[in-house]
Structures are given as structure tokens and as C-alpha cells.
Amino acid sequence: MSASSVIHYHANIHKALKYAVRLDLIPSNPADKVERPKKDHFVGSFFDADEVNRLFEVSKGTKLELPILFGAFYGLRRSEVIGLKWDAIDFENDTIIIKHTVTSVNLDSKHIIVAADTTKTKSSMRTLPLVQFVKNRLLAIKAEQDNNRRLCGRSYNKEYLGYVCINEIGDLIKPHYVTEQFPKLLEANGFRHIRFHDLRHSCASLMLANGVPMKQIQEWLGHSDFSTTANIYAHLDYSSKLSSADAMLTGLGIGDAR
């Protein structure tokens, strides 16, 4: 079990025992005496621009096309991708609003779908620009879905009407499907292994590599505070290190770093 998981479980246990103390059920909180491990410093894997573009190509026309597109280009979380609805996409003003999520809970070995008009944090609810190449693909997919609905008639699953990530008969592309099938797609096409969530990290790393300020990346990804973004991606911000080196060299009258 990772240190992060231990910290998470400890926090929940501590909270429950704290409530028990308040109700005078126990004299003190034994969790106070437990030493928590230090949180792991996670360094994710990233795809570069060539790998992302090739991934777009091999996933086109598959059930993973849209999850990959939104995960890599917009840096959406899996829950945000699956929760995307057509009414959140404004084709006239070219905007996408991230406001609905879909997750799955494993209960008695069954995946239970949980949909909610909420996001991970308040900052996660955000509006992003609908760029032309994504717009063109979405319009084509929307037309395909409309045609599938007409062809299937009563056999079409209307439970998920309005969702973007659905298959030919209207079934939702489930969160666990994305997690299970993504590594299979990578292996089948000769990619190195990364997790689906690493597409979000790939998005951030490409932005940093192209000079996008950390603050803008925070807003793009929907992080609740700047420190979250900085803690995860500061080690990738090599351009800022070059700027710092230039400042030192200029101050010393030596030259520049590049």
C-alpha cells in the first residue's frame, strides 16, 4: 500500500475517532499517536508531441477516441471526460463547460455508475475553448450518433441520451472500460505503457514545454490551488530554470545560458 493511501485511510479513521471523542464514547483519539508516513513524491509518465499525435491517429474511430482526445488535449480527468454532455458544448461560441462527472464504484464485484452535476473541486468546474479540430470531430461524431439512434429505433439505449461518450447503441462508455482498454490499445500499437491519467500529465508537460505559464496550466487543468500544479509539474518547468540561469549570468556579466 502506498504512503498516500495510508495517509488517506488514517485521515478517515482519525476523523471518525475524533467524533467518538466528542460524543464521550472514548476518552482520547488513539489515531493521534500513529505516525503517518511521508507522502510519496509522484512523478508521472508523459507522452511527447509525436506520441500524442500518433495516439490520436490510432484511436480514431474507436471507443477510446474521445476519452483520449479530451484527456490529452484538454487534460480532462477520466470522470470529466465520461461525464461530458452535448449541452455543455457550445458550437456557436466555441466553448466547452466542464460541470458534470461520471465515476464508477465497485460494489459486490459490480461496477455501479455514479453521475453527478458536480466536479472534483469548485475550480474543476471550468470553461475551455472549443478548438477547430476538436469541433470538427465532435460534429461528425454527433451526426453519427443521431444516425445510430434512428437506425436502432427502440433498441437504442435512451438512458444516456445527451452524453458525448456513448457507443453505437447508446450505451455509455464506462469509466472502468477506459481504464481497462487504454493499456491494451497502447500495447497493440507499440506504445510504451502509461496510465490513462498520464494523458492529463502529458497535456501539462506539453504546455510547459511551449511556454505556457504555470498559473494558466492550473486554470486549464482545474486544480484548486496553484501549489497543486506547482508541486506536480515544477520539475518539468525547465524554461524557468534557464531564465534563472540567464538572470544570474547577466548579473555577473558573463553571458546567457543558451
Locate each region found by the language model:
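C-terminal secondary-structure termini that scaffold catalytic or DNA-interacting sites
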Residues: N93, S104-N106, H111-M125, Q132-V134, ...
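Short, basic (Lys/Arg/His-rich) helix/loop patches that form interaction surfaces
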Residues: A3, E57, G61-T62, Y74, ...
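A short, basic/aromatic helix-end/turn motif that makes direct DNA contacts
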Residues: G83-I89, Q218-S224, A234
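Proline-centered turn/helix-capping motifs that create local helix->coil transitions or kinks
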Residues: A20-P30, F91, H100-L107, A140-R154, ...
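DNA/chromatin major-groove-contacting recognition/catalytic segments
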Residues: N53-R54, V58-K60, L107-A115, N210, ...
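N-terminal core-binding DNA-recognition domain of tyrosine site-specific recombinases/integrases
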Residues: M1-L25, H41, L172-Y177, R192-D198
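Basic, Lys/Arg- and aromatic-enriched nucleic-acid-binding interface segment
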Residues: I7, R22, I26-S28, D32-W86, ...
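Catalytic-site neighborhood detector that most strongly recognizes the C-terminal catalytic loop/helix
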Residues: F46, V102-S104, K135, L221-A247
